[in-house]
A protein has these predicted regions:
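C-terminal lobe/tail of nucleotide-utilizing enzymes
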Residues: 1-23, 181-259
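Structural motif
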Residues: 25-30, 53-58, 99-103, 135-138, ...
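Short, flexible loop segments at the rims of nucleotide/cofactor-binding pockets, characterized by
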Residues: 29, 74-75, 108-112, 132-135
Length: 259
C-alpha cells in the first residue's frame, strides 16, 4: 500500500524551491484563449520567465492560439519516453509551453513512481522560472485537475455571451468549499458591451449568493500573478506539491490550503 504521507514528505523535499507564483487559468471560448495567449506573451516579453502547463488538447490550446505545433505531452517526458526539451514548445522570448493534457489525467490517482518522476520534472522546470501558468481544463463534471487545483490563484476568463458565462458558473459553483476564497474573473472581448457587462454582473451575484465566493474583476493577468506572489512565502512553497498530491489522492477539487 502506498503511504501518501511519506510520499508527500519525500516529494516535498525534492521540490523545496517550488516556483514562487502558480496561477491556474480556466478559459471559456476562443476569445478567452486568445486573451490568455496575449497576456502570457506580454508578461514574458516584459521579462517574466513563464512556464505553461497546457492541459487543453490540440484544439483550444495555447500552441494552437500561437499557430505552433506540439508533438509530445509532458507525461511522455515524465515517463522518460522522450526528453523534456522535446516536449517544450517555445512561444516567444521567456515563454515555454508544455502540453499536459495526458499528464493532468495521469495525476489523478498517480502511483508513487509517477508522482516522484513528476516532482523531479517539476524541479527541472522551475529553474529560472518566475511564473507557472496552468491552462486548466475541467472534466465533464467541472472538476479541476490536481495541478490546476493546487495553484495559488485561479483566473476564470469568459466571453461576453451566455454560453461562456454559464460554463464558467458550472465550474465556479463546484469550488464553494475549495482552496480559493476569491477567484479572479476576466472578460475577453466585448468589454464595452452592456449585455456582456450585465452577464458578468449577474454571474458575480449568483456566485456570491449560492457559494459565498467573491469574484474579483481583472483586466490583466499581472494582477493575478501579483496576488499569487503575496502567498508565496517559504512555507507555502513547501506545501505546493503536497497540495498537488492531496488532490491526486482524493480526486477532489475541494481540498483547502492548509495554514
Amino acid at each position: 500500500m502506498i503511504r501518501f504521507g511519506d510520499q508527500a514528505n519525500g516529494l516535498r523535499r525534492l521540490l523545496r524551491q517550488a516556483p514562487p507564483q502558480v496561477v491556474s487559468v480556466a478559459t471559456f471560448g476562443p476569445d478567452a484563449v486568445r486573451w490568455l495567449a496575449r497576456e502570457a506573451r506580454t508578461g514574458a516579453a516584459a521579462g517574466r520567465q513563464t512556464v505553461v502547463f497546457d492541459e487543453v488538447g490540440a484544439c483550444g490550446s495555447l500552441a494552437d492560439a500561437y499557430a505552433l505545433s506540439a508533438r509530445f505531452d509532458l507525461l511522455q517526458a515524465v515517463d522518460r519516453h522522450v526528453g523534456l526539451e522535446s516536449v517544450c514548445v517555445e512561444a516567444g522570448q521567456g515563454l515555454n509551453l508544455f502540453p499536459a493534457a495526458r499528464m493532468a489525467k495521469a495525476l489523478v490517482g498517480a502511483d508513487r513512481i509517477l508522482a516522484a518522476r513528476f516532482a523531479q520534472t517539476c524541479q527541472r522546470l522551475q529553474a529560472g522560472a518566475d511564473l507557472w501558468l496552468v491552462h486548466a481544463r475541467s472534466s465533464e463534471d467541472f472538476v479541476l485537475s490536481p495541478l490546476a487545483a493546487a495553484a495559488h490563484r485561479l483566473v476564470v476568463v469568459v466571453e461576453g455571451n451566455a454560453r461562456s458565462v454559464t460554463s464558467a458558473y458550472s465550474l465556479i459553483k463546484q469550488l464553494a468549499e475549495g482552496p480559493w476564497p476569491q477567484i479572479d474573473l476576466a472578460l475577453a472581448g466585448g468589454r464595452d458591451s452592456r449585455d456582456a457587462e450585465a452577464l458578468i454582473a449577474n454571474l458575480g451575484a449568483m456566485v456570491l449568493a449560492h457559494s459565498g465566493l467573491a469574484l474579483r474583476r481583472i483586466n490583466r493577468l499581472e494582477a493575478s500573478a501579483a496576488a499569487a506572489a503575496m502567498v508565496s512565502d517559504e512555507q507555502e512553497r513547501e506545501r505546493f506539491l503536497e497540495r498537488v498530491l492531496g488532490f491526486a489522492r482524493r480526486g477532489s477539487r475541494t481540498l483547502a490550503f492548509e495554514v
